[in-house]
Amino acid sequence: MTLRNDWTRDEIQALYDQPFLDLVFQAQQVHREHFSANTIQVSTLLSIKTGKCPEDCKYCSQSAHYDSKLEAEKRIAVDKVISEAKAAKDSGSSRFCMGAAWRNPHERDMPYVLEMVREVKALGLETCMTLGMLNQSQAERLSDAGLDYYNHNLDTSREYYNNIISTRTFDDRLNTLDHVRSAGMKVCSGGIVGLGEQKQDRIGLLHELATLPIHPESVPINMLVPIEGTPLADVEKLDVTEWIRTIAVARIIMPYSYIRLSAGRESLSDSDQALAFMAGANSLFSGDKLLTTPNAGEGKDQVLFAKLGLVAEKPKVSVRAMAVDAMSA
């Protein structure tokens, strides 16, 4: 399939609106053209600083604006992070992601996170961080330290965005992605479905991602986990088929990207997850927690992998070079 970054919303909607089985079948065909059919990239996510975030994301338990009963924690010691990274590697993860509840890292935080990147990288793991907004200097220093991926989600469509967050603009997010890309790191960026958005917003999110100059190497598709005390605690649950449609379209229009099952997976049946893999998902977060939300534990994932005949991918150089070459051809 030809790699494109000129998708129109009408084209994406036409894909999204196909009969469900036709869409999933097409996505699986595209998936097999670019990836091993039964291999899943496994990541582990650790919160290195929890709670009291100044942002007002309406879905997030870590926001200081809401009474979610989350107990805030100061940043954890580097040696504790390394211990967790070693355990993640022993459990089959190929990538270790570190997240901090910051609007952006302060300069006083940079030596701490740079040391962390170097130490985790030395274990032979791919490294990823999500620390909020970055300026160009911070992005370059993270890249120089060996950071492979930087996560900064767009969350939802540009049109729906202001219903979800007011303390950071949509363009602020795009600017951070530009800094990450300019510094030579790989981009991890996706969004959340089930925020109370409409179908057009899911299409809009996919359109934003697929029309970036270079597609994100990793695209997390989260399902909202309602958190008591947040404004979205009682939002109507999205039908799982809409989540799978979003995954399938992401696979078709971003064929070289890893499509990751992220938050919300803990509530899904094995059959739902199998259908998501059929729709082109080929990455997931393993472990009992994703920052502060529950997740399918490592033991459950091992059982699921055995049931479906899936194997975990080994750490390797990502497909970024292939995607860049294809887009410049």
From Swiss-Prot:
EC category:
transferase
Does Manganese show up as a keyword for this record? no
Q: So, what pathway does this thing act in?
A: Cofactor biosynthesis; biotin biosynthesis; biotin from 7,8-diaminononanoate: step 2/2
Q: Does the keyword 4Fe-4S apply?
A: yes
Binding-site residues for [4Fe-4S] cluster, renumbered to this chain = C53, C57, C60
Q: Which SMART domains match?
A: BATS, Elp3
Pfam families linked to this entry: BATS, Radical_SAM
What binding details are noted for the cofactor?
Answer: Binds 1 [4Fe-4S] cluster. The cluster is coordinated with 3 cysteines and an exchangeable S-adenosyl-L-methionine. Binds 1 [2Fe-2S] cluster. The cluster is coordinated with 3 cysteines and 1 arginine.
Q: Any idea of its EC number?
A: 2.8.1.6
Q: Where is the Radical SAM core domain?
A: 38-262
Q: Which domain of life is it from?
A: Bacteria
**Annotated GO MF terms:** 2 iron, 2 sulfur cluster binding; 4 iron, 4 sulfur cluster binding; biotin synthase activity; iron ion binding
Which cofactors must be present for this protein to function? [4Fe-4S] cluster; [2Fe-2S] cluster
Q: Which InterPro entries match?
A: Aldolase_TIM, BATS_dom, Biotin_synth/BioAB, Biotin_synthase, Elp3/MiaA/NifB-like_rSAM, rSAM
Q: Which family does it belong to?
A: Belongs to the radical SAM superfamily. Biotin synthase family.
What is this protein called in UniProt?
Biotin synthase
Organism equals Acinetobacter baylyi (strain ATCC 33305 / BD413 / ADP1)
Organism lineage: Bacteria, Pseudomonadati, Pseudomonadota, Gammaproteobacteria, Moraxellales
Q: Which gene encodes it?
A: bioB
